[in-house]
Amino acid sequence: MILINISLIFPIANSSGRSFFFTALLISVFTDIFALAFGKLLGKRFIYPSISPNKTLEGTLLGLLIPSFLFLFLGYLFIEVEIIGLEVFSEFLVISLFIDSYGYLITFFIILISSLASISGDLLASKSKRLMGIKDFGNLLPGHGGVLDRIDSHIICIPVFFIFYSLI
């Protein structure tokens, strides 16, 4: 719990903190988007039907891999390719910082682990709701549940990404 609080307070402190937070948030969002899209398109095997009945193996795997390759590619563009105007975006993402510190392969696994943490947060929230016998954590957002339903995947992803970020 303390780690979650630190990871949410730290980004406000300085611009690199905001970049960290923005990057972690994007990893989590892209993981959700790609897992959902490819799960609906290609999904045949359900992985946890009792916890999250619509999660498929295909969606989960592509939800993990595509953001990992996408962010690695963005990091490559920021470091290796000089495109006018692209340096503005590198200020918002800390991926190039990871690549400089760890190299491409380790950075790939950091993003992959962060994506896995995102999916774990979603599954943890789903399991909690099943245990409580509710569909959503609230009804603030019609059709989407409560605020916690919107950020469940970020709850674990951001602290995990923060651990790697703090080691740089």
What does each of the following model-derived ranges do?
Residues 154-164:
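Hydrophobic, well-ordered secondary-structure scaffolds
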Residues 1-156:
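Interhelical loop and helix-boundary elements at the membrane-water interface
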Residues 77, 81, 162-168:
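Juxtamembrane boundary at the C-terminal end of a transmembrane helix
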